[in-house]
Structure formats: C-alpha cells, structure tokens
Amino acid sequence: MQGKVLMIDHEKCTGCRQCEMVCSVFHNGASNPSRSRIKVVKWEHMGFYLPMTCQNCEKPFCVEVCPTKACHRDSEHQRVLIDRDKCIGCKTCIIACPFGAPLFDTVERVTIKCDYCDGEPQCVRFCEAKAVTYVDADKINVGRKRDTSLKFSDLMRQLIGGY
C-alpha cells in the first residue's frame, strides 16, 4: 500500500464525536453527524469508544460487489472511493463491508465513505485526544496493529458474553 492512511487509537478516544461533526461540516457545510464519513461506536457502560472509518482493504469487498463500479480503487493513492455520479444507492457495498464503513446519505440518496477530506482529514486536525492520526502507510507498525487488534478482540468477547 502507498500513500497515507488514518490510524485509530481507540485507547485515546474520549467519545466526544468531534470527528463526526467536523467531517459533516467539511463535506456538507453543516453539522449533521448522520452524514459524517466517520462514526464513533460507543459502549458507554464500559467507557469504550471506537472511531470507525474505511480501512481501504487490500481486497475490498465493496469494490467487488458494486454493480455500477461506482465503488473503485484510485490507482494513484490506492484508496477506495465512491463515484457519486455512478452510485445508484443500492447499498450492496454497505452490506459487503465487514467494517460497516460505507454509509448511506439519506439526503443525497447515495453511499458515502471516508475520502480523507481531499488529503487533509478534518477528523485528524480537530481530534484533541489525538485518537485519529494520518500516517504513511509504510510506517504503520504491524506489531502494534496486531496487539491493538488482539485487545479489541478480547474486549468484543467481553461485550458479547465471553465467546
């Protein structure tokens, strides 16, 4: 992978949802978190918050299932993008994504997802807790990602009752 990616540190997230607000303002001109391309999943009783956005998967299911090819990989930056002009709002990409990253914009009736705010992610810029950072893809510490994934997996087991 090349370029830059969003790195989420759930341990730093306070659940303030500032990222959702600034994303919606950047893209829509008004604060409307339901139209944000990043969502903070909250488990209030555990004090656990997880900002979720597109992972730009190596083999993105959303791209594979899109009937109009609106969902595609940008060859220059290797990001998964959605061409709003081609999107027919069928939601197959939403169903296919294991992370729930593509979202349906009920106002414009098309699927939306993180586009890194044209190279200057507003969620990163305004996250006071520094839970969301924008880093070179090659510099992601694989060991740290693995450790974080294992911690998250353990937490999910606790949340669903010890499976």
PLM features per residue range, with description:
Residues M1-C13, Q18-W43:
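N-terminal cysteine/histidine-rich coordination modules
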